Amino acid sequence: MKKKVVVGMSGGVDSSVAAYLLKEQGYDVIGVTMQIWRDEDVFKQSQEGGCCGLSAVEDARRVAAVLDIPYYVMNFKADFKKYVIDYFVSEYERAYTPNPCIACNRYVKWESLLHRSLEIGADYIATGHYARIAQLPNGRYTIANSVTAEKDQTYALYNLTQEQLRRTLMPVGEYEKPQIRRIAEEAGLPVAHKSDSQDICFVPDHDYASFIENETGKTYEPGNFVDESGNILGRHKGLIHYTIGQRKGLGITAATPLFVKELRPATNEVVISTNESLFSDTCYISDINYMAQEHITPGTRSIGKVRYSHRGADCTLTPMENGMIKCVFDEPQRAMTPGQAAVFYQDGHVLCGGTIEKMVNLMGDLPI
């Protein structure tokens, strides 16, 4: 009997080819698009390459017709609001910089979709992510790097559970992007040349602050820009407008370029300093998800990534009694930002990951 797999179809070329590849491999494939955004705002998401709007549904439906597979649209709006939107807003309100795609992957694209898929008798779910599922000799499942480093998406998948990984297929991770487009062309898929989605799907204009203000109905108080000695340099528009390492939009004239070094919600201050002050070699990670191992030992060597675009750097990990991990990089890293994920790799797969809580800069003046 054929194994049944539900493929999360965003209307893009990657998930479309994932469905095609799995059908070619003999799976009983069902296509599903997750409706996650409010109807009154869906028009905002219908831009070319988007994954949340009406155009995504239309494109996915056309692909399913070509592949001759069943296709459904499932409503996950409540879960998306709870696990992604509310999280996004609350993190900015506490002066953290969140990664909503990571939350969406864990709690919506996997937890919610997997639960619904199992209810309809599926054995697996599948996506078009550039990553691979691997089972290690110790029996645990992990996420292994895609064959193409430029498209690798393992960073955003670090917090999937063992049960989720066991039930997941990721066929696209074995290919490079040009190969995926060529497969789509040869299969006659209508999205073969569709552009990739680049933005946070619910804030396509990048104006996070306006989105948060509209979502909460709150007005966020202006405050002071200060230097590291506490001298007032000017006025800021509200903490939600800023993130660590930011240079644009500060409105401060100086002889040398200035950047956001720290956000202080207790005093409603934004600390401004030079680029050199942004470098740290130590950070502390909370909410750890252990993937390749159940735990780590003091002195564990790894390659750490502290943002999606980070190439990764050698580091040493030490577990702490409070459940956090202390990470010390061999070389200082720029603008490690509270709220962002830190993901650690060994031998080309995810060891563990978590959320950056605090960092200690090279002067040691930002202790946890």
Features from the language model and the residues they span:
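AMP-forming adenylation/ATP pyrophosphatase catalytic core
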Residues: 126-135, 142-368
